[in-house]
Amino acid sequence: MKEYKTPSYEETVKLGERVAKSLPKGSVVAFLGGLGMGKTAFTTGFAKGLGIDVDVSSPTFAICNTYIGEENTLYHFDMYRVDGWDDLYSTGFFDFLETDAYMAIEWSENVYGALPEDTLMIEIERISENERLFKMYKKSEEEE
């Protein structure tokens, strides 16, 4: 497990950018953390690290936002309202796993059983109003 502290929104964005640049195509990142923890800020940087220059917003109502760059695609999911396998199938989640696109998944605890074993799990904890602690590990390493 790797841990990173970010003192501000801007540093959270930069962390997301660095992580994106370190991952191979087709990678899945899954966030664990409540409202206002920095999931969308991290995803903003993640998109930037993939060369996708867009305004990232939480896909709360759309369930999935798609961001397309010249070389990479990012599917940004919010699984908060997903309740069961039927709901998950209707999002296109499993189809997107078969592509070389990147996926960022908010509220991943709701779809934990469907996440690939090599998913990068990112637990976010609030230290103070602006400071966050990010704990990162592969899903397959959780049981160890």
Feature annotation, model-predicted:
Residues 1-18:
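N-terminal pre-Walker A segment at the start of P-loop NTPase domains
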Residues 39:
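Conserved lysine of the Walker
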Residues 2-3, 48, 86, 94-144:
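Short phosphate-coordinating micro-motif centered on Lys-Gly-acidic
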Residues 52-67:
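Short beta-strand-centered segment that lines the nucleotide-binding/catalytic pocket of NTP-utilizing
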Residues 32-34:
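P-loop (Walker A) phosphate-binding loop of NTP-binding proteins
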Residues 28-30:
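Short hydrophobic/aromatic beta-strand immediately N-terminal to the Walker A/P-loop
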Residues 20-25:
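Phosphate-binding P-loop
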